[in-house]
Amino acid sequence: MEKRIVCLAGDGVGPEVMESAKEVLHMVERLYGHHFHLQDEHFGGVAIDLTGQPLPQRTLAACLASDAVLLGAVGGPRWDGAKERPEKGLLALRKGLGVFANVRPVTVESATAHLSPLKKADEIDFVVVRELTGGIYFSYPKERTDEVATDTLTYHRHEIERIVSCAFQLASKRKKKVTSIDKANVLESSKLWRIVTEEVALRYPDVELEHILVDAAAMELIRNPGRFDVIVTENLFGDILSDEASVLAGSLGMLPSASHAEKGPSLYEPIHGSAPDIAGKNKANPIAMMRSVAMMLGQSFGLTREGCAIEEAISAVLKSGKCTADIGGTETTTSFTKAVMQEMEEQALVGRGR
């Protein structure tokens, strides 16, 4: 297989974890005979320094012409006083790509379950599917005076249907359960959300559907996270709940994410920030970035075997006791990456010997 991938290293630790992603992709090429054209483009703060814009037209054009986009990290205090904020580039990139579904898997490795703030953390394995383009962040009118401020929460039927369909498609390949989170006891938008969700569910008779109000869902994520398989919710609720859920893994350096469009390339990135305090020190945890690569291989390219090989190698290295400082170890970004690559190679040799 031959694919073109645009690499947006971005800011802070972004270039370091992006290098890990590239090395893992090169290992996949070598072990499985694929070829990936990796194209570096400027994005975020570094793009502001060079062009005055966080998302140059050249970068967006390259992303639109690609098969997938990998993003390292964006932002940092260096640009706090800048006319353009690096984070604006991320919003513009999402809009330019037309991505509407943010997918965040939340899993806890048995080797790192002790880092989670919860007991029985090794039972956690669910996915949050968040709608990205509608809701209160993007609805109008928005206005503010000294005395009153107004935001508008609007959802159209087609926006709800496509995000809920995405969740059901994902659940049909997992444990076959969708939890839809809303505030249908108060909000008209949530009432429509629930109606449309019920209609979509009829097309997936083998997938269980449950509805939970957002306040109860926030409690259940802490009290009983093992009950969830695929969570689907609107933009604001998803923003809050996905961040709450990410804490369960014990480190932001562990979790990947994907943002999908109806057509065109998807965007893959770790959920952690740019971590400017450790940038350039070879201390960043590359796991979330490598898992983002694994998601890309499976979800955009259909290379499920190759994506699983990366995940299995990461798990094996963690079980061996090797990990970076954020999860209690002494490995560097580069040494952990090398350990994962070596494990991938060894597992491939074992597989061929069977």
UniProtKB/Swiss-Prot annotation:
SUPFAM superfamilies in alphabetical order: Isocitrate/Isopropylmalate dehydrogenase-like
Catalytic activity: (2R,3S)-3-isopropylmalate + NAD(+) = 4-methyl-2-oxopentanoate + CO2 + NADH
UniProt binding sites for substrate: R94, R104, R130, D215
Keywords: Amino-acid biosynthesis, Branched-chain amino acid biosynthesis, Cytoplasm, Leucine biosynthesis, Magnesium, Manganese, Metal-binding, NAD, Oxidoreductase
Location in or out of the cell: Cytoplasm
Positions that bind NAD(+): 76-87, 273-285
Matching InterPro entries: IsoCit/isopropylmalate_DH_CS, IsoPropMal-DH-like_dom, Isopropylmalate_DH
Cofactor(s) listed: Mg(2+); Mn(2+)
Binding site for Mg(2+): D215, D239, D243
GO biological-process terms attached to the record: L-leucine biosynthetic process
Domain of life: Bacteria
Pathway: Amino-acid biosynthesis; L-leucine biosynthesis; L-leucine from 3-methyl-2-oxobutanoate: step 3/4
EC number: 1.1.1.85
One Pfam family recorded for the sequence: Iso_dh
Location (main, coarse): cytoplasm
Coiled-coil ranges per UniProt: none
Subunit annotation: Homodimer.
PANTHER family from the UniProt entry: 3-ISOPROPYLMALATE DEHYDROGENASE (PTHR42979:SF1)
One annotated Gene Ontology cellular component of this protein: cytosol
GO terms assigned for molecular function: 3-isopropylmalate dehydrogenase activity; magnesium ion binding; NAD binding
UniProt record similarity statement: Belongs to the isocitrate and isopropylmalate dehydrogenases family. LeuB type 1 subfamily.
Function of the molecule: Catalyzes the oxidation of 3-carboxy-2-hydroxy-4-methylpentanoate (3-isopropylmalate) to 3-carboxy-4-methyl-2-oxopentanoate. The product decarboxylates to 4-methyl-2 oxopentanoate.
Name of the encoding gene: leuB
Cofactor: how and how many bound: Binds 1 Mg(2+) or Mn(2+) ion per subunit.
Protein name: 3-isopropylmalate dehydrogenase
Important for catalysis (site feature) positions: Y137, K183
